[in-house]
């Protein structure tokens, strides 16, 4: 999308640069980072700035801290980043306090400073202009490379851009790549274009489904959200997840698909169990005959075969949402198999972030996918056709 100001359009030579990254990475109970994909994704932009003789200030949030706590510190991120870049990272003890400001002022060309968790400042999530002004005062150039938070109007994402003119703000390589992939997917997909949509709730994906229907050739609906559609068709779904208030909307989507000539595929069988737990009995049952007191927790083998057939001739596949409760091993098979089939084909495969990216990583298919988005919510909102606040803030005024 050429109307977004890119990092390449900016004269960075020897400037002090602020890069908003998305280092919101999962950690275990000992605060060890369990997946550093988001950190690795930021490296091309960081290296580009270093190659241009910049001094670099990095900023990110981590989790949703209610107060300042070592549990949410970016210290582990600094260590991992130092290892990945093979370079010392200066760590600030705060965000806009004396320590951060002193270290920012003394930062020399080729050095990197990582600020402490942005959400330790209450103003961050309120899009507070005073916080934004303090952050902006540390640098000459602002780069946003945090696609995962672009759908949020936060201080370090939106308000901060008001303090930089078009020659001094832009999108990093990761953000540009994310926007380009989503834009091409919606505007110029190679056909047949198949969307595979799962996850637990219809409510979270309703707008995306509505926006996708006129653009796709086929739509596969799996995961917990499929049961609202199956119920809308009059099937017995037992105790499976149901959003009763959305039955009418589900019917509308099915009707709209039919009117547009888009084939919509739902599970034909499911893995059912009396409870969502690893140590309960399970059985394969037809999707329309889930026994009372049982719930569907994954797609069954017949559904896996059907969905494999549906995507076999696809040229473009967009996948957002697991096919079952993949966190529990015995209900993860459908999601893992879908990951294998999508990655093995010749289609351009775009994976929406969040849980779907976790499934792909667990299946060992990450390297075979064309593109894995780093942002679940942001990716979904782009597909819904929404303008993301963080992206809008980087548009060139000439193109508005």
From Swiss-Prot:
Its EC number is 2.7.2.3. Substrate binds at residues 22-24, 38, 61-64, 119, 152. It catalyses: (2R)-3-phosphoglycerate + ATP = (2R)-3-phospho-glyceroyl phosphate + ADP. One of its GO terms (cellular component) is cytosol. PROSITE patterns: PGLYCERATE_KINASE. GO terms for biological process: gluconeogenesis; glycolytic process. ATP binds at residues 205, 296, 327, 353-356. One of its GO terms (molecular function) is ATP binding. Keywords: ATP-binding, Cytoplasm, Glycolysis, Kinase, Nucleotide-binding, Transferase. It holds the Pfam family PGK. Coiled coil: none annotated. It is found in: Cytoplasm. The keyword Translocase does not apply. Pathway: Carbohydrate degradation; glycolysis; pyruvate from D-glyceraldehyde 3-phosphate: step 2/5. Its main location: cytoplasm. Belongs to the phosphoglycerate kinase family. Monomer. This is Phosphoglycerate kinase. The lineage of its organism: Bacteria, Pseudomonadati, Campylobacterota, Epsilonproteobacteria, Campylobacterales. The gene is pgk.
